[in-house]
Amino acid sequence: MKHLIPLIVMASVVLAVYADRGYGGGRRGGGYGGGGYGGGGYGGGGGGYGGGVGGGRGGGGGLGGGRGGGGGVIDGKDDVGLGGGGYGGGLGGGQGGGGGLGGGQGGGGGLGGGRGGGGYGGGGGGYGGGKYGGGKYGGK
């Protein structure tokens, strides 16, 4: 059992590096909360398709896991009010926060974690997080 721990740690680091580079998924939150279905694969969250100022749910899937929350000031049909919410899963897991003009924080947890969100756009976490989950206008 002890010899498995270093292997798990090394694999986590490698995957986190690839995730931060956007491997298998978008790094950008996108516009004012809209734009594309981000995420997927190892790269994790980002994107969102709800439109509006705070809007939409983040992408996700694969090992990156998770769906970002988000409120949607204009289009909130698929969301959980202004406070956001959402849920995750997979190795990257975590919850996406956000919502409203203030955005908030994306999820995290799992082996990599990290924070998305912030600014107008919100965003997701994903496996290994990533530096580009937030930003004033939903991601850079």
UniProtKB/Swiss-Prot annotation:
Q: Does the keyword Ribosomal protein apply?
A: no
Residues with the modification Glycine amide, per the entry, are 138
Q: Which GO terms describe its cellular component?
A: extracellular region
Signal sequence annotation: 1-19
Its localization reads: Secreted
Q: According to its UniProt record, in which tissues is this protein expressed?
A: Expressed in hemocytes (at protein level).
Q: Is Signal a UniProt keyword of this protein?
A: yes
Keyword tags: Amidation, Antibiotic, Antimicrobial, Immunity, Innate immunity, Secreted, Signal
Q: Which GO terms describe its biological process?
A: defense response to Gram-negative bacterium; defense response to Gram-positive bacterium; innate immune response
Other notes on this protein?
A: The peptide Ctenidin-2 corresponds to the shorter peptide indicated as conflict in the feature table.
Q: Which family does it belong to?
A: Belongs to the glycine-rich peptide family.
Q: What is this protein for, i.e. what is its function? A: Antimicrobial protein with bacteriostatic activity against the Gram-negative bacterium E.coli, and very weak activity against the Gram-positive bacterium S.aureus. Lacks activity against the yeast C.albicans.
What is this protein called in UniProt?
A: Ctenidin-1
